[in-house]
Every structure is written in structure tokens, then in C-alpha cells.
């Protein structure tokens, strides 16, 4: 991590000075020019332009230009970000006290086709902590392949992936809402000339009446329903890249300009 900081500083014309303390390493980044009124340090000036200079931990966020980067640049950004407050031990997650930063990290990971869960941990003292957790072994493998972690944690991640090499991925990363059964009952089955009992037989399951329609359906099962009824709309829904998630919170943001 120190080498990465030293190398990055060179891009601003800054020659870093590294000093080993008792149990940590201090990196000094002296300005390459004399600082006077209106003349800022090139690194702090850059951070000001990104609007992330001198923020508290709970105020931090991903600068807007990062979201416009190419996938390989986003991966590099996350690789070094994970080396700060990320974890790869019991699970792969990034921790922060800033909800906005957590949402930004999750959005960047989704750009790389890596799905996450957002958990909030309320502490007895202090602020709520947010954990952006990489969901499931398949996403962990993709995270290790596409992003990784800089430094020692990167080697820990590799060991974690090797140790879980025989773990089979669960394909059910989400469930299509139960409302889709209304389409099956009133469109798919009548068009196919099938009854609900015949559909249950085609799916290799016992007929359970209306109980089947009360819960969400996995993509795998929905795909089999689509095949049994020859419903192309259902087939497209089962294979789409739209992820379904339960709405758990609505937070007002105040008046905003819309277009």
C-alpha cells in the first residue's frame, strides 16, 4: 500500500517521504512548490475539485467522475479501496459509517456484475455501520478475478477462494415476485390449454392448489414453467438481468429538480 501511495504521488509531482514508526509507516507528501495565499498543495487541490477534501468518515462518498470510468479502472479503484476498510476473512465486505459511500461501492460493484447485500449494524455507541457484502461464492469468485485486493488481504482472498473451490454456487440469487403467478394463471395456462394440476405434473411436483401462488418463484422454476407452457414472455423474464429485491426503506431526499 505504501508503494502505491508513493507511486500515485509522483503523478502530482510530489516526492513522498516514508518514515517507519513503532508499529506503522508514516508517508509524508510535501508540496513540490511553496504554498502561499491562493496556492494549494496539488493533492489537496485535486481532492477539493472532487469535493471529498476534509470530510468526516460518515460524510464520505464516491466522487462522481469515478462512475464514468472504464470497468478496468473501476476495478482498480475498488481494489485499493478494499485494502483500507475492506474485509476478506469471515466474509467479503466493505465497512463504512457513510450510507452514501456504501451505496456507491455497491453501485460500482454492480457495474462489474458483482452482486452485493447492504447490511446495517447499529452500535451501542457511535454511528451506524454499513457493510457492503459480496453475496455468495459465485460473486466472491468474480470479485477475486475482476477486482481483488491490494496487499496482504489480496493473498488472504486468494486463500479463501481456494479453500471454497468445491463449494457449489446457489443459482437462486433472487426471486421473481409472487405477482407473476397471476400472469401464469390468467395468460400462460389458458393459452397453453393446461390446468394448474397439469402444470404441477409437468414440473415434477405435487399439486398444492393455490398455495403455489402465494410466494415468489426462483428463476430456475420460472424457466421450467415457461418451457411447460411455451410462454416466451416468461422465458425472457426468467433469463433477464433484472434483479429483484425487497423494498425495506424509503427515505425522503427533499425537493429536487426533475426533467
Residue ranges with predicted function:
Residues 1-259:
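Internal intein/HINT superfamily modules and their associated LAGLIDADG
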Amino acid at each position: 500500500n505504501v508503494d502505491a501511495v508513493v507511486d500515485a504521488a509522483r503523478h502530482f509531482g510530489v516526492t513522498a517521504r516514508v518514515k517507519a514508526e513503532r508499529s506503522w509507516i508514516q508517508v509524508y507528501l510535501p508540496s513540490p512548490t511553496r504554498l502561499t495565499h491562493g496556492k494549494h498543495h496539488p493533492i489537496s487541490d485535486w481532492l477539493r475539485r472532487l469535493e471529498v477534501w476534509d470530510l468526516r468518515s460518515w460524510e464520505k462518498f464516491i466522487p462522481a467522475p469515478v462512475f464514468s470510468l472504464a470497468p478496468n479502472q473501476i476495478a482498480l479503484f475498488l481494489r485499493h479501496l478494499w485494502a483500507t476498510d475492506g474485509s476478506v476473512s469471515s466474509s467479503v465486505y466493505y465497512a463504512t459509517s457513510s450510507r452514501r459511500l456504501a451505496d456507491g461501492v455497491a453501485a460500482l460493484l454492480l457495474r462489474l456484475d458483482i452482486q452485493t447485500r447492504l447490511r446495517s449494524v447499529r452500535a451501542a455507541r457511535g454511528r451506524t455501520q454499513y457493510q457492503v457484502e459480496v453475496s455468495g461464492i459465485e460473486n466472491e469468485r468474480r470479485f477475486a478475478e475482476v477486482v481483488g485486493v491490494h496487499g496482504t488481504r489480496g493473498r488472504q482472498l486468494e486463500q479463501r477462494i481456494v479453500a471454497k473451490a468445491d463449494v457449489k454456487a446457489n443459482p437462486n440469487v433472487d426471486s421473481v415476485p409472487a405477482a407473476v403467478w397471476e400472469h401464469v394463471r390468467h395468460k400462460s395456462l389458458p393459452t397453453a390449454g393446461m390446468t394448474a394440476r397439469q402444470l404441477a405434473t409437468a414440473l415434477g411436483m405435487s399439486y398444492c392448489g393455490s398455495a403455489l401462488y402465494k410466494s415468489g418463484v426462483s428463476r430456475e422454476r420460472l424457466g421450467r414453467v415457461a418451457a411447460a407452457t411455451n410462454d416466451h414472455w416468461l422465458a425472457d423474464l426468467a433469463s433477464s438481468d433484472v434483479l429483484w429485491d425487497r423494498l425495506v426503506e424509503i427515505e425522503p431526499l427533499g425537493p429536487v429538480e426533475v426533467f
